[in-house]
Amino acid sequence: NWLEEMHRKSEQTKKKIEKHLLDAPQVSTDGTVVTENGHQSYIRNFSILDWVLYESMGSKGHKALSSIPFLQQYAGILVHDHETSLYSYGLDHAECNVHLLRYLVKNGEDTRHIWSSKLHSLLVEMNEYRKRLIGRGEKSLPDKTLQRLEARYDELLEYAKQERKDKPSGFRWATKEETSLLNRLKKYKRNHLLFLHDFNVPFDNNMSERDLRKCKNRQKMSGGFRTEAGKEIYCSLLTITETCKRQGKDLINAFKTILSGASLFA
């Protein structure tokens, strides 16, 4: 059928999209669960402002990631929500701070510790300050300001240690989750604060999350995919349609071009 034909003939167009992504200094990525023949599988996207690529995956782990050509070649910054498997790819990594803000709110509610709200406020303050500088045409933070903000971050982690000693949580599960969160904040401090060092790096991974909504909505409304081939066709078509929208291209003409055997984009 024409969908299978589109999938086959879109290979060159997808390679051009991938090339633009490979040339980008930072790329946002996320994955979502879909069902395939009744079993759990995934769709992952790679997004920048004008280009987006969707990939079908059997699982979310390292083995599946290693089969994605884009990840094998990419040498820039990957922006994601603490997917530790992704740290084997790319040149550097930026953590999504919107997700972190949610975890901090939850931790404060679960443990009643106030360090969470203090760090939440600090991260929001950092982001707002950066936005003001960008609005004034600045390219980076003043060194002294950067040092002050990072020192405040470190102080709050020390404050958290003392607060936990003085006011231990009454719930073992909450204590365990808080320990994991604090370990993450310490180990991945640089990745969470990379947006302060490089103004091209986003504060969050919202772009990639938005680009996955169609996949999530399809799963809710239509259910999963019957076959792996069907999921791959869907990813190809979504790659073409979503990129065409970003580029302001007419979809009908774009489909005609691909079905004629030609490719889109330079």
Question: Where are the regions a protein language model picked out?
Answer:
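Catalytic center-proximal scaffold of phosphoryl-transfer enzymes
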Residues: N1-A266
